[in-house]
Amino acid sequence: MRKAGLWGLLCVFFVSEVKAAIVLEEERYDLVEGQTLTVKCPFNIMKYANSQKAWQRLPDGKEPLTLVVTQRPFTRPSEVHMGKFTLKHDPSEAMLQVQMTDLQVTDSGLYRCVIYHPPNDPVVLFHPVRLVVTKGSSDVFTPVIIPITRLTERPILITTKYSPSDTTTTRSLPKPTAVVSSPGLGVTIINGTDADSVSTSSVTISVICGLLSKSLVFIILFIVTKRTFG
């Protein structure tokens, strides 16, 4: 009896040590806020085809929190939605797919797929999932726009009021006109708008006529003086 009792204790101790030694390696997912987590958890179709599955969160130092579970019948493909969580159960493919949408920083933590049959302990189907959610980059490139102002020439306008009708007339400022007069030569040169109408030939003829008239006067005076003193 004592030997049987000792062997039983040794077996229990050995099994507990083996269970403690089997620690599933975590699978890490690094995502940004607003993205979607997708995890595929395979299971043994011979053992768990007709079993209820669940997606759980493992808070530090607390009991596992069951977020969403599959619904009957378990032998047919089904899809369950619970808030941001979705379970897609496909027994023919021996696959449980989990989706978490619109991730936030507060969703960071440890999760797992399990065979859910309370009050018995859940059976872990896949590696625990370590989810790390970070905020996205808020840096947005804003182009700098520098306005360029070009100076344009505009005509000068003069506004004149005429009474009594108080009508307003707008006209362009005329170009300045300069008048150069030569009394001796009898030539008048107009510079400005009127000067454009005077041709070069008319000016030349006027100058020649003036020189001839002066020459004739000089000759007449010379003849008169000679006769007087002759």
Swiss-Prot record:
Effect of deleting the gene: Deletion mutants do not show any influence of the antiviral T-cell response. However, TREM1 deficiency impairs secretion of CCL2 and TNF-alpha by neutrophils in response to viruses. TREM-1/3-deficient animals have decreased neutrophils in the airway and these neutrophils have a defect in transepithelial migration.
Protein origin, superkingdom: Eukaryota
PROSITE patterns linked to this entry: IG_LIKE
Keywords assigned: Adaptive immunity, Cell membrane, Disulfide bond, Glycoprotein, Immunity, Immunoglobulin domain, Innate immunity, Membrane, Receptor, Signal, Transmembrane, Transmembrane helix
Stretch forming the signal peptide: 1-20
InterPro entries associated with the record: Ig-like_dom, Ig-like_dom_sf, Ig-like_fold, Ig_sub, Ig_V-set
Glycosylation sites recorded in the entry for this protein: N191
Subcellular location: Cell membrane
Membrane protein topology class: Single-pass type I membrane protein
Membrane-spanning segments: 203-223
Biological processes per GO annotation: adaptive immune response; innate immune response; neutrophil chemotaxis; neutrophil extravasation; neutrophil migration; neutrophil-mediated killing of gram-negative bacterium
Pfam family, any one: V-set
Principal localisation: membrane
Cytoplasmic side of membrane: 224-230
Disulfide bonds: C41-C113
Domain Ig-like V-type, first and last residues per copy: 21-124
Spans within the Extracellular topological domain: 21-202
Entry's Gene Ontology cellular component terms: plasma membrane
Description of how the protein assembles with itself and partners: Monomer. Homomultimer; when activated. Interacts with TYROBP/DAP12. Interacts with TLR4.
Function as written in the Swiss-Prot or TrEMBL entry: Cell surface receptor that plays important roles in innate and adaptive immunity by amplifying inflammatory responses. Upon activation by various ligands such as PGLYRP1, HMGB1 or HSP70, multimerizes and forms a complex with transmembrane adapter TYROBP/DAP12. In turn, initiates a SYK-mediated cascade of tyrosine phosphorylation, activating multiple downstream mediators such as BTK, MAPK1, MAPK3 or phospholipase C-gamma.
PANTHER family, per database record: TRIGGERING RECEPTOR EXPRESSED ON MYELOID CELLS 1
Name of this protein: Triggering receptor expressed on myeloid cells 1
Organism: Mus musculus
